[in-house]
Amino acid sequence: MIAVGSDISQKTIDVQILDENETYIKIQNNEIGFNKLLKKLSDNPCNYHFCMEATGNYYENFADFLVENGFQVTVANPLKISKFAETEFQKTKTDKQDCKLIAQYCQEKLLKKHGTYKKPTEQQYQVKRLLSYINQLKQQKTALMNRQKSCKDEFIEIELKKQLVELKAHIKTAESKLSELTKSEEKDRLKTIPAISETTARVLVHFLTMFDFKTANKFTAFAGLSPQQRKSGTSVNKKEKLSRYGNRILKTALYMPAVVAYRMGVFKKMTDRLEKKGKSGKVVIVAIMRKLAVLAFNLYTKGQVYDIRKFG
């Protein structure tokens, strides 16, 4: 099987095919470009395995087109590609170099053991975009509230209040639409986890449904909840920190439930143990976020409800 790496931007796609000639082609990120590539690949689609990074939503149409035409596709976590680049000592960063690196990653890692991409349903895409839209609205709301607190002009303060009312109405409408699309038994089961709200349960079910996570560790890595620590001899000993990678929407959705769970004293044995080790409040919150994600994965995959005797 031939590995193919794709570096995708809003308007173009750089494609590196690891065939005998190491063919490189740049195409438009639209159907015209996709068909141009299809003509270039004269062999049976089963002979190719495409790999691309899960960045934004620029990859979606291309990945769907490939699957519809019989190609195998993997949408990889950018963190894995980044780590692979480090092992290859790659320092040059160009679109052409990036797509070749992704192809090499596909060849060395994925062809041995890979998880292929399945085209999401139209409803899953709609939920994904609604979640992103709601997240953006909430960020705008926070920014407006901060401006309102520091505002010293009466006229501007009144205008900000009006904008805030409108924004809250937009959020309510979007969440109502999201609720229509995400009615499910899975969501109700996840709501049995302490501190998991309706909104958070929707987000969790969406990602657990849309991506085929084989293990809880893969789900937490996707969320960016794998702590990183740099420690080597006595020269490097930095504080443990949360990975800057991971899905921002999922990570954001788990943050407030973790704070609430901490205040409620949920998972007290775990938090007491971490605090005795001198871990900071931030590290404890991240540990709870990870615990919630693992619980969600287990309840979702096993079809169970939360039981404190079983899950702690």
Describe the residue ranges of each PLM region.
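Nucleic-acid-processing active sites and adjacent nucleic-acid-binding tracks
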Residues: 21-49
